[in-house]
Swiss-Prot record:
GO CC annotation terms, alphabetical: nucleus; RNA N6-methyladenosine methyltransferase complex
Location in the cell: Nucleus
Protein name, entry field: N(6)-adenosine-methyltransferase non-catalytic subunit METTL14
Family classification: Belongs to the MT-A70-like family.
Keyword field: Differentiation, Nucleus, RNA-binding, Spermatogenesis
Pfam families membership: MT-A70
Function noted in UniProt: The METTL3-METTL14 heterodimer forms a N6-methyltransferase complex that methylates adenosine residues at the N(6) position of some mRNAs and regulates the circadian clock, differentiation of embryonic stem cells and cortical neurogenesis. In the heterodimer formed with mettl3, mettl14 constitutes the RNA-binding scaffold that recognizes the substrate rather than the catalytic core. N6-methyladenosine (m6A), which takes place at the 5'-[AG]GAC-3' consensus sites of some mRNAs, plays a role in mRNA stability and processing.
GO BP: any one term: stem cell population maintenance
Molecular functions per Gene Ontology: mRNA binding; mRNA m(6)A methyltransferase activity
Record has Membrane as a keyword: no
Annotated stretches, region: Positively charged region required for RNA-binding: 245-254, 297-298
Length: 456
């Protein structure tokens, strides 16, 4: 009991210190001098009551009936003057603006250590976007508090660096170039088309031809994708979400994930973009749709995918106006997730050429691609895959085994989604996600109804 009391007191002391820092007080004991005291709050309440009473009095005078017969007009006039004089005195007083200094104004929950965490209001006041305050977003410090994940990322990066093919690139106009001339099938295809939306938001003239979604849909992606493959399509933040799904469907892929790029403005707060004519608010994120072709199971296809290694969010600083390049972190997400070595980047640039990838784009300044040389890197049966070590297999997140394989005691009782959830094959089918190769996209535990009874 004493330890619990000491813990509560320590939290209270820390909370008061943080409050003092936020409110500009000298110390935790001087918070009361900054906040409204009880006398000030009582004075504000009395002022409101006086104003309300004076308003009621003036309304009563305006609705007063005609004077009775025999009552002197001078008495009526004198009563009206007596009721109007207090109102004139209040009007002559200087206007006093109410300044709300109470710390509970923006308090979200009684256990909050930071009472002024209304980031939307902070954006209005300073121009700093709310996502600026998300911590540990960089690749270097993201897993500082998770040593196993940090070690897993290090081992995978070392293995990827050893198994990468030399960087290859080809300057080609994708409007007229036949992708089948690459003479190869690919496990991963990343598309970064220059959409009209990018140039419309920046408000500057395009230095390269922008593509419409009709042109993007005409690309022969289905002709160069392997029997099981993934496609990653950058589609902006507007109507591209719908058109991107249409492209995936036309190419024979199923949409399975949406990777969001959240843009911060720490270096240049308050920077505004040209507002899209179809938008009400300024958009500060972009979407990269991920599609899958073929059948990929997380539990059985560990030689081709490693799920749940990364998250589906990229949080980086927004590039300068006119720069439509995407964050380099998308390459790390793809390489950590898919173990296929045949990677193709369409609409690439000189700055995106990297080992392990074939980069094709109209803005490249040089070419070194040779179809025979590229095919020679994948002659042996297992050469299209990066492989896996015992340590990586031990550290990587895996799909939980079925309940029937966990032991005698673990299979007792039903799932959280109802009586039938978790029993036999039907229960496992209900617990299975909508995408078998998904990176953790489960609909919930025990079926679609999480912890409640199924609707009648």
């Amino acid at each position: 009991m004493n330890s619990r009391l000491q813990e509560i007191r320590a939290r209270q002391t820390l909370r008061r210190k943080l409050l003092a820092q936020q409110l500009g007080a000298e110390s935790a004991d001087s918070i009361g001098a900054v906040l409204n005291s009880k006398d000030e709050q009582r004075e504000i309440a009395e002022t409101r009551e006086t104003s309300r009473a004076s308003y009621d009095t003036s309304a009563a005078v305006s609705k007063r009936k005609l004077p009775e017969e025999g009552k002197a007009d001078e008495e009526v006039v004198q009563e009206c003057k007596d009721s109007v004089e207090p109102q004139k005195e209040e009007e002559n007083l200087p206007y006093r603006e109410e300044i709300y200094k109470d710390s509970s104004t923006f308090l979200k929950g009684t256990q909050s250590l930071n009472p002024h965490n209304d980031y939307c209001q902070h954006f209005v006041d300073t121009g700093h976007r709310p996502q600026n305050f998300i911590r540990d977003v960089g690749l270097a410090d993201r897993f500082e508090e998770y040593p196993k994940l940090r070690e897993l990322i290090r081992l995978k990066d070392e293995l990827i660096a050893k198994s990468n093919t030399p960087p290859m690139y080809l300057q080609a106009d994708l409007e007229t170039f036949d992708l089948r001339e690459l003479k190869s099938e690919f496990d991963v295809i990343l598309l970064e088309p220059p959409l009209e939306e990018y140039f419309r938001e920046t408000g500057i003239a395009a230095n390269e031809k922008w593509w419409t979604w009709e042109d993007i849909m005409k690309l022969d992606i289905e002709g160069i994708a392997g029997s099981r493959a993934f496609v990653f399509l950058w589609c902006g933040s507007g109507e591209g979400l719908d058109f991107g799904r249409m492209c995936l469907r036309k190419w024979g892929f199923r949409r399975s994930e949406d990777i969001c790029w959240i843009k911060t403005n720490k270096d240049n707060p308050g920077k505004t973009k040209t507002l899209d004519p179809k938008a009400i608010f300024q958009r500060t994120k972009e979407h990269c749709l991920m599609g899958i072709k073929g059948t990929v199971h997380r539990s059985t296809d560990g030689d081709f995918i490693h799920a749940n290694v990364d998250i589906d969010l990229i949080i980086t600083e927004e590039p300068e106006i006119g720069n439509i390049e995407k964050p380099v972190e998308i390459f790390h997400i793809i390489e950590h997730f898919c173990l296929g070595r045949r990677r193709l980047h369409l609409f690439g640039r000189d700055s995106t050429i990297r080992p392990g990838w074939l980069t094709v784009g109209p803005t490249l300044t040089n070419s070194n691609f040779n179809s025979e040389t590229y095919a020679s890197y994948f002659n042996t049966p297992n050469s299209p895959l990066t492989g896996c070590t015992e340590e990586i297999e031990r550290l990587r997140p895996k799909t939980p085994p079925p309940k029937s394989d966990r032991g005698f005691g673990a299979s007792r009782g039903g799932g959280r989604g109802g009586a039938s959830a978790g029993r036999g094959e039907r229960g496992r089918e209900r617990n299975r996600g909508s995408f078998r190769g998904d990176r953790g996209n489960f609909r919930g535990r025990g079926g679609p109804h999480r912890g409640v009874f199924a609707p009648r």
